[in-house]
């Protein structure tokens, strides 16, 4: 596996990998890799001739009081995991490489980026859209793979790709991969490392409460009362606050006030200990 830090070197390496019409699948990450990331890598390998991964902790998607400095960084360990999975190339740019002096461009995707995490973390998805667009332009992949755990991020990236007429990758080749969970139901996340043993045990209550809410909504219960009960259950499990618990259209992320059978997603963000955990699950046919 090649590990590359300079854009000129990346372009040459990508050209070499694409030689002879070979295809590339891209898995962008912020490092602190876990089984969820490796699942993306394996799906990428199934879809293309070569897999390219990136590790870049993007400062533009962190707010002023968020965990940029504390976010786990373990490049050597992560690189070894990617190499063991057969990744051909690791793109690991510096902040100065991605945002040199004088950098002045920002991508903002209205609508889908303004609710849920977008409302709780202003500017977050501008940072996500900007860095992902840059990474797409740098790597020029045929496919890009993202975890469905951050459903809103996936929706923002697809909207951006569609609106900007991106072809590498085309929006239809931006692939969402189902959330990987522990046996307890807790969604895998790099931020789970912040949890103590007690907090991790309490955090399992999130997915259980979400499943109960989904069963109620699909069974005909009122959406508003089901979400209110979900919030109460999350707090009772040991979470200190709930940023949001929303039912939204799976494609547009518009609020669903009355569930009528169209594909929807239950999206939740809640805080426990020093961690802000997000999760989502499908409601109705997917």
Swiss-Prot record:
Q: Which residues form the active site?
A: 37
Major localization class: cytoplasm
Q: What is this protein called?
A: Pantothenate synthetase
Give the GO biological process terms: pantothenate biosynthetic process
- Give residues annotated as binding beta-alanine: 61
Entry's Gene Ontology cellular component terms: cytosol
| EC code(s) of this entry | 6.3.2.1
Q: Which reaction does it catalyse?
A: (R)-pantoate + beta-alanine + ATP = (R)-pantothenate + AMP + diphosphate + H(+)
Q: Which taxonomic lineage does the organism of this UniProt entry have? A: Bacteria, Pseudomonadati, Pseudomonadota, Alphaproteobacteria, Sphingomonadales
The cross-references to InterPro entries, in alphabetical order and at most eight, read:
Cyt_trans-like (IPR004821), Pantoate_ligase (IPR003721), Pantoate_ligase_C (IPR042176), Rossmann-like_a/b/a_fold (IPR014729)
Q: Could you state a single Gene Ontology molecular function term?
A: pantoate-beta-alanine ligase activity
**Known role:** Catalyzes the condensation of pantoate with beta-alanine in an ATP-dependent reaction via a pantoyl-adenylate intermediate.
Q: One Pfam family, please name it.
A: Pantoate_ligase
Where in or outside the cell? Cytoplasm
The residues that the entry says bind ATP are 30-37, 147-150, 180, 188-191
Q: Does the keyword Cell cycle apply?
A: no
Q: According to its UniProt record, in which pathway does this protein act?
A: Cofactor biosynthesis; (R)-pantothenate biosynthesis; (R)-pantothenate from (R)-pantoate and beta-alanine: step 1/1
Quaternary structure per UniProt? Homodimer.
